[in-house]
């Protein structure tokens, strides 16, 4: 019986198969390295709030404003009344505070009652899930993900927020672990902490280095982060 396929059919088949395999590799690679945040995204906010001043110079803890991070999946943005809780006494007449008073101070001449519309900076893809409470309560500090907030005038999205970045921490969490009372500090240094705190491991040996401290906390809290898909994707 005569061959109904042209002589180069096999070559075409293998060529198409190779292209499909290459495309699949690019897709899977793209998923692995996908950016969850827009690189260097640093939007202008309706109120000129300086993280450098508050978290840096004044050394306020992150949870002083983002208290929801300790009890829910989202860190949240403080409501305007929380801001005025401080600023009704501190620089209340500053023009920088005016948008807050317009939104939440009925005694202010320019009061409108319109809420301040903050611009979201850190936005995960719809298929990814991150729980702030779970990380903070297991010794992961805010700066491990958000970077040097104490040095930022305007908050910006982390440059390396990729799946690979998350997996690297889940596979080796010890370098990122810190005592629970230090998770919301932008100034924490494990070396400085060990200079002022005497900590001994299970055998009574003195812990001397940051890595020893991280590994000790990992053992104490029995931390074994998941690395399968369902850990972050639901």
Predicted regions and their residues:
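N-terminal Lys/Arg-rich, disordered targeting/topogenic segments
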Residues: 1-9
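Hydrophobic membrane-insertion alpha-helices, especially the h-region
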Residues: 14-31
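Sequence context surrounding c-type heme c attachment/ligation sites in exported
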Residues: 43-93, 131-234
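Aromatic-capped interface at the extracytoplasmic side
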Residues: 26-43
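Structured, soluble extracytoplasmic/luminal domains of envelope-associated proteins
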Residues: 81-126
